[in-house]
Amino acid sequence: LQQLGVDVIYLNPVFVSPSNHKYDCQDYDHIDPHIGKIVEDCDGLLSPGDRDNSHAAKYICRVTDKRNLEASNKLFQELVEEIHRRGMRVILDGVFNHCGSFNKWMDRERIYENQEGYEKGAYVSADSPYRSFFCFKDQNLWPYNPSYEGWWTHDTLPKLNYEESEELCKTILEVGKKWVSPPYNVDGWRLDVAADLGHSNEFNHRFWKEFRKVVREANPEAVILAEHYGNPESWLLGDEWDTVMNYDAFMEPVTWFLTGMEKHSDEYREDLYGNSEAFIGAMKHHMRSLHMGALYGAMNELSNHDHSRFLTRTNHRVGRLSYAGAEAASANINPAIMREAVVIQMTWPGAPTVYYGDEAGVCGFTDPDNRRTYPWGKEDLEMLDFHKRMICIHKAYPLLSKGSLEFLWNDYQGLSYGRFSDDEQIIVILNNQEYERDVHVTAWKTGVSRKGAAAFQRIMISSKDGYTEEAEEYIAEAGILQVRMPAYGVMVLYHGAKDKYK
């Protein structure tokens, strides 16, 4: 990761959980020993056909034994220290809208019921200290009351009942504080389905204001970013979230334009494929919802744990693992389109965020196929090298982090935009067609004079035949750049102090 050029590592949930995705938290206070450290173990796997998890002795030992939990927290502490030593930062995933049915507060699986040192869960007993943490529809079903509210009716994801429990609010605020404080010292939180927390918009805002206050008092530099679909303006007023995962003003417009695919690979739309007018319109509309600080810090992703891999979307195949099969996700993919997307990602306003494996050519339909293991020893080395080079360009030119944005040219399957300041310009040109063509770009919109000639240096070009950083000069005459663009091509040009960034 350090060699790739990563500055921040955002970890999907790492707390105790029975699943591989871990968005069904079992214990917010401890790192899962299965990805941490197991120092005490025992026999006792479930027998074939046995669905009673209270019989899973081996699992119960691993996730309830304090020695395993403490050792795992210690290992995580050491990991964060090493990440910081290498000049990188760490963001944790906070799943606070709901927990899992395995959670010690609920204990539907009766894992904690007979374990020393644990209170009875709210599912198990009406006298549980955690009863108010959840909303039970029928008060007459204890012991083992299954009538609790589930997020989107999922009984494996009990929704947390904040409005009725001051103790729950206090507990989650302590969790938020704990992990950004010594000895763990993480650098911020990504908040899962943040707008869903609570049962009213009013309470939701009140809680996140308090969360921000507690977290920032513990760590003034901690970032707070949220998963959110739709307009986030009311949460971005400076007292709740810092920014968001940028679906509306990045992932969706980019994937529709370059691939015509919906981000789960559930739909193909010919009317949006290559439609640069729709791309520009969507970007302008949704970027207005983000103030400058939120926009420049927004997580610009091509793929993530909830959606299909971008490289898979380049095959224009509607499908899911359940009926299309894993091999279909990598059939007829187009790495050149992936490189176009990576260039946009690394030159667009915001924080480019690479989902593990995208840089190595990993394919996959939506969850769970998008969570394949990293292909150690089988990486697409060309894609990996391209990511390294584009990350290097992103970090080398401050324009790409702070510069203004202007659209310069567009047509069907074609787009150009500029990032610029008073004395420097970067121009990106894309041709998403399967054949080469000439384009004329209005470079003057970035501040280049229309009265003479301006020399732009090419710093990256990619096409269906590969890519290169080999320098080549392009002259803008009277503020117009004329460029021959290759098939499935993208070019990055720079004008300014010629040797400034060497």
Question: Locations of the language-model features?
Answer:
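Substrate-binding/active-site clefts of carbohydrate-active enzymes
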Residues: 3-7, 14-183, 211, 217, ...
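Carbohydrate-interacting/catalytic domains
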Residues: 1-8, 16, 334-335, 347-354, ...
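Short, solvent-exposed turn/loop segments enriched in Gly/Ser/Thr/Pro and often Arg
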Residues: 10-21, 93-103, 192-198, 227-232, ...
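Short, flexible loop/turn elements at secondary-structure junctions
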Residues: 15, 32, 96, 164, ...
